[in-house]
Regions:
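N-terminal membrane-targeting hydrophobic helices
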Residues: 1-263
Length: 263
C-alpha cells in the first residue's frame, strides 16, 4: 500500500480528512528510498520501535485518531499482524560488523559509553542538549536484545531520518555564551563510527535477512477480510475515494476499534 491508501483507510476508520493522515503514513514508508525491497520495512514497520520513533515526530492526536492507533493500523495494513522489531531481526544472521567490536578512534571512544557527554565535549553546550537525539539512537535496543538492534537506527537511513524529529541542526550555546549549529547527522555519524567502525547503509544491516512470506504480504489478505468483517465495511481497503464520511458510524467502543486495527 502507498501512503495515500493507508490514509484512506484511516479516514474510513476514524473520519476526518485523508490529508491529515498522509504525513505519518508517508514517514513510515520513507525507508523504501534507502532499500528497494520489502526488507526496508524492518526500519520502521513495527508496533514497538516504529511507534516509538513516530512519537518523536508527530503529535499524540492526528486528525480524529491517536498517533498510536495510526501506527498500529499501518503495520497491520502492510504485514497483516502486529510485527515487532524482533519479528524482522529474528530472520537475520549476525554479520561480522555486529559480532566483532572494534576499538573506536580515541576521539570517539566516549560515544560508546556516555554519548551525550561525549557530544557536549566535542561540540560544546551541555549533555542535556544532546540527550534526546542520543535517546533516539538507543530506541531499538529498548525493544530488542538482538545484536543488530543498535544498527537499526545507526545506519545512513536512520541518521538522515533523525532530521524528521530534530531538524537539520541543534542550536547550542557554548560556555563562552556564543551560539552554534550542530548538524544532527554529525551526531549520528559519530555514534555509528564509534560503534561499527564505519557508516552502514540500511542494506548492510539487513543483508542477511531471510525473505519470509509474511514480509511480502502472505498474511495480509486474510487479515483484511477479518478487519472488513469486524468493521462491517467491505470497502475498508478500497482505493476509491468514497466512503470517507462513514467513520462516525463505524467505531462504537475502543475495544471494537482495537479488533479492527489489530485483526
Amino acid at each position: 500500500m502507498k501512503p495515500i491508501h493507508h490514509a484512506l483507510v484511516s479516514a474510513r476508520l476514524f473520519g476526518g480528512a485523508v490529508e491529515d493522515y498522509v504525513p505519518l503514513h508517508n514517514a513510515f514508508d520513507m525507508s523504501k528510498a534507502a532499500l528497494g525491497d520489502m526488507r526496508h520495512r524492518s526500519a520502521l514497520h513495527s508496533v514497538d520501535h516504529g511507534r516509538m520513533v513516530m512519537a518523536l515526530i508527530f503529535p499524540e492526536r492526528i486528525g480524529n485518531a491517536s498517533r498510536d492507533e495510526l501506527c498500529i493500523q499501518h503495520v497491520h495494513d502492510d504485514q497483516g499482524f502486529g510485527a515487532t522489531l524482533d519479528s524482522w531481526l529474528s530472520e537475520c544472521t549476525v554479520p561480522t560488523f555486529a559480532r566483532i567490536r572494534r576499538k573506536p578512534p580515541a576521539s570517539l571512544e566516549g560515544f560508546l559509553e556516555e554519548p551525550a557527554v561525549a557530544a557536549a565535549a566535542r561540540w560544546g553546550g551541555e549533555p542535556e542538549d544532546f540527550a534526546a537525539i542520543c535517546d533516539y539512537y538507543a530506541l531499538p535496543g529498548r525493544v530488542s536484545d538482538h545484536p543488530l538492534a543498535p544498527a537499526m537506527s545507526l545506519n545512513a537511513f536512520g541518521i538522515f531520518f533523525s532530521e524528521m524529529a530534530f531538524g537539520p541542526a541543534l542550536t547550542i550555546t557554548t560556555r563562552s555564551g556564543r551560539q552554534k549549529y550542530v548538524p544532527v547527522r554529525d551526531i549520528g555519524e559519530c555514534l555509528a563510527i564509534a560503534r561499527f567502525g564505519r557508516l552502514l547503509s540500511l542494506k548492510d544491516v539487513v543483508e542477511t535477512m531471510a525473505c519470509k512470506d509474511w514480509m511480502t504480504g502472505s498474511r495480509v489478505a486474510r487479515s483484511r477480510r477479518r478487519r472488513c468483517a469486524t468493521a462491517g465495511r467491505a470497502d475498508l481497503f478500497s482505493q476509491e475515494m468514497d466512503g470517507q464520511d462513514a467513520a462516525s458510524s463505524l467505531v462504537v467502543t475502543e475495544s471494537e476499534l482495537s479488533c479492527i486495527l489489530r485483526d
